[in-house]
Amino acid sequence: MTEGYYTETYITEWKDKDNVIISLWHWVDFDNDTPEQVGVVELAVYKHGEHEGEALVWNLYVDEDHRRKGLARQLMNEAHKTAKHLGAKVTALEWSLKESPYWVIEWYTRLGYDEKEFGPGNALMKRPT
């Protein structure tokens, strides 16, 4: 098998939420190569309390050598599917605008996120799962 990518999903159940880690792996020669982790996205799916039915996404990362190939979008699609499977109705994300360029907001908007709130220096965006 030639070069490719695949994802693995790990779910840890807690009392009030499920923590999810989705890892992205890359291989050059599937039969003779040890895959390397080149991306990750993490999310928490809340089962009870104020945020019940919401999934919060954080820590989306793709290694620089593997960017511009649609892999971050692939990880986010996997995160949305997993959140929906675990009962989330909404997926949210937030970050500091001081630490991220504005194009990040535009990218998430293209993924279907709407800007729900802006705090001083912070952004919160949501989309249905």
Task: Spell out what each predicted region is.
Residues 1-58, 82, 118-119:
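Acetyl-CoA-dependent GNAT
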Residues 44, 125-129:
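Short beta-strand-to-coil "C-cap" segments at the C-terminal boundary of structured domains/repeats
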Residues 46-48, 65, 98:
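Short coil/turn motifs at secondary-structure junctions
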Residues 58, 63, 96-98:
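Residue-level recognition of the GNAT/N-acetyltransferase active site
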Residues 88-90:
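Short, high-confidence coil segments that cap the C-terminus of an alpha-helix
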Residues 108-119:
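Conserved acetyl-CoA-binding loop of GNAT-fold acetyltransferases
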